[in-house]
């Protein structure tokens, strides 16, 4: 082979406030993503490929905030807290950029970095009662900035549904979505 065979694939969902006009459209989008993700996971097993995603990986972690934060270098030489944000053309670019590489050195706004890295949404009232509080940790800052309150509620439902399916699949050793429809 010119390239070694694939061993791992990550399929993550799209985050775009303009992708769907209504909460029903967004829910349908995430429902389709969930079905396709678990189908891909099953297909991957047949080929010896581990299929994962950010949401799936988060189930293996206990954390205080949704994301540890990034040291993501953009094409402009700036440092972004979030891999979703990499271009000055993006609405939240200046919210997530905290430094740059200049003259062969990393220059950081340490106060902004600290603000970004300590930001957490897991103190929301609804999170206190959620079984995913320490895995979802209140959701992603990028989601919070991107979506309306109603759209964020769809994200919460998606997170819970996706996680329950993942856990049921692990317990049963099969894709419950596939067996649910037969």
Briefly describe each language-model feature range.
Residues 87-90, 96, 100, 122-182:
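Radical SAM enzyme core and accessory elements
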Residues 1-8, 40:
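Conserved AdoMet/S-adenosylmethionine-binding subsite of the radical SAM
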Residues 30-58, 85-131:
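C-terminal accessory region of radical SAM enzymes
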Residues 78-79:
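Hydrophobic "anchor" residues
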Residues 12-16, 56:
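Active-site beta-loop-alpha junctions enriched in small/polar residues
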Residues 64-67:
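Short, small/polar residue-rich loop motifs at catalytic or cofactor-binding pockets
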Residues 74-75:
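Short, ordered coil/turn segments that flank beta-strands lining enzyme active or ligand-binding pockets
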């Amino acid at each position: 082979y010119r390239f070694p065979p694939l061993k791992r694939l990550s399929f993550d969902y799209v985050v775009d406030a303009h992708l769907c006009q209504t909460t029903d459209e967004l829910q349908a989008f995430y429902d389709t993503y969930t079905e396709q993700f678990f189908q891909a996971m099953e297909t991957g097993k047949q080929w010896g490929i581990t299929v994962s995603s950010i949401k799936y990986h988060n189930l293996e972690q206990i954390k205080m905030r949704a994301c540890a934060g990034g040291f993501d270098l953009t094409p402009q030489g700036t440092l972004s807290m979030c891999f979703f944000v990499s271009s000055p053309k993006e609405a939240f670019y200046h919210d997530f950029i905290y430094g740059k590489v200049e003259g062969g050195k990393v220059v950081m706004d340490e106060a902004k970095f600290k603000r970004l890295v300590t930001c957490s949404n897991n103190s929301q009232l609804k999170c206190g009662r959620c079984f995913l509080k320490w895995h979802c940790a209140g959701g992603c800052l990028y989601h919070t900035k991107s979506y309306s309150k109603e759209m964020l509620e769809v994200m919460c439902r998606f997170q819970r549904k996706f996680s329950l399916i993942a856990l049921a699949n692990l317990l049963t050793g099969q894709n419950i979505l596939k067996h649910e429809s037969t």
